[in-house]
């Protein structure tokens, strides 16, 4: 009796599975047929892009927004794909930076839909009823169109001396032997070294907008902390001394726009807080877990 009922249940389950498989095959076939249709037979997906334009060579011309229409069927999924398509097929005068197309180099940083991010990893909103506005990074001088002037930003980065500094470099085998670092000390650099210097965080910070000449900004300060906390670096005290003025660090008011907008998911606000703790004496740099110059003897 039980065996008979079990066979009936298994039979019904088998029939149900078979029907579901047939539906899946049917749906898959329909999708393939739709994809196989020529693009002319498919309904266009026209997306409007409103892009900031300004050419300094045109004397007296003010910045303006120019609208382009892109068929999303013939374009890659990212905003950078659309910009490249516009430049290649519609308007070769459109100017922007780009390089790796993988979120690694930081070249294509811009303000997209009100958020500072990287065009190469920012997906296009497929809602064609809304246009997408694209601006250069805010509160920076503009070279042309979507290209900001990064000179001040890079000069600030240069001023923190972003390289490993040792007190006895002359007596060490520089370039011939590694400086040792424990796993624990190395882990302190996680969330710091990944910064690609795209400036999305700094240009989203109101304090940086108001004090760009004196306040170093989230990106540069996070890199400063990366070298201050590195167990192999022996110049941390001097690095901190350079940050003791009222502006370099203390213009940060923990607004935290920097952390919200970082396309790499980093936390510049936390790094700045750690620098403040070191400057105030609430914390100190711990001694290295390993003798860093052991291989140089």
Swiss-Prot record:
SUPFAM superfamilies: 2Fe-2S ferredoxin-like, alpha-helical ferredoxin. Signal peptide: none annotated. InterPro entries: 2Fe-2S_ferredoxin-like_sf (IPR036010), 2Fe-2S_ferredoxin-type (IPR001041), 2Fe2S_fd_BS (IPR006058), 4Fe4S_Fe-S-bd (IPR017896), 4Fe4S_Fe_S_CS (IPR017900), Beta-grasp_dom_sf (IPR012675), Helical_ferredxn (IPR009051), SDH/FRD_Iron-Sulfur (IPR050573). Most abundant in the adult thorax and low in abdominal tissues. Residues 185-215 form the 4Fe-4S ferredoxin-type domain. [4Fe-4S] cluster binds at residues 195, 198, 201, 262. Its EC number is 1.3.5.1. Its main location: mitochondrion. The keyword Endoplasmic reticulum does not apply. GO terms for molecular function: 2 iron, 2 sulfur cluster binding; 3 iron, 4 sulfur cluster binding; 4 iron, 4 sulfur cluster binding; electron transfer activity; metal ion binding; succinate dehydrogenase (quinone) activity; ubiquinone binding. Binds 1 [2Fe-2S] cluster. It is found in: Mitochondrion inner membrane. One of its GO terms (cellular component) is mitochondrial inner membrane. Keywords: 2Fe-2S, 3Fe-4S, 4Fe-4S, Electron transport, Iron, Iron-sulfur, Membrane, Metal-binding, Mitochondrion, Mitochondrion inner membrane, Oxidoreductase, Transit peptide, Transport, Tricarboxylic acid cycle. It comes from Drosophila melanogaster (Fruit fly). GO terms for biological process: aerobic respiration; mitochondrial electron transport, succinate to ubiquinone; respiratory electron transport chain; tricarboxylic acid cycle. [2Fe-2S] cluster binds at residues 100, 105, 108, 120. This is Succinate dehydrogenase [ubiquinone] iron-sulfur subunit, mitochondrial. Residues 47-140 form the 2Fe-2S ferredoxin-type domain. Pfam families: Fer2_3, Fer4_17. [3Fe-4S] cluster binds at residues 205, 252, 258.
